[in-house]
Amino acid sequence: MKYSQNQIVYVIFFFIILIVVKPIESVEWSDCSDPSDSFKIEKLEFSPEQPIAGQDLIISVSGYLNKEITKGEAYLAITFDRIPILKLKGNLCDGMGVTCPIPQGNYSTTTINQEIPENVPQGYYYVNFVLYDQDDLQITCVDVQMNITQS
């Protein structure tokens, strides 16, 4: 059987995609902050590494804050399999395990527990999380990708 050059190129392209584009097996994150943002993330960890519906996701963050935060807002956007499903805006200093004012300097917390609802569909979730300070200046920005499974 003879293959055309186009068929060979498509097969090679398909295998390259399989090798390069790996499925998300744990929580992955990237820093989408601007260089001028006041919080520089040094470490962001999630436990468990494989989020499971009906269980808590514990988030640990540490970094350096170059100015005091007296108040602020948090913005959260969640996408499920590329479909936007939720956008939230909230008070940074109320209900997030954070107490304001937050002093300038090294910052570390392991108190962020997020329950993943038991009925959440299994699949790939993309989260964009942006914080703003009392002057409406961006504090930091994080993009998170995770594959939530059922227990």
Swiss-Prot record:
Keywords: Lipid transport, Signal, Transport. This is Putative phosphatidylglycerol/phosphatidylinositol transfer protein 3. Belongs to the NPC2 family. The keyword Transcription does not apply. Monomer. Catalyzes the intermembrane transfer of phosphatidylglycerol and phosphatidylinositol. It comes from the Eukaryota. One of its GO terms (molecular function) is sterol binding. Residues 1-26 form the signal peptide. The lineage of its organism: Eukaryota, Amoebozoa, Evosea, Eumycetozoa, Dictyostelia. One of its GO terms (biological process) is sterol transport. Pfam families: E1_DerP2_DerF2 (PF02221). SUPFAM superfamilies: E set domains (SSF81296). InterPro entries: Ig_E-set, ML_dom, NPC2-like.
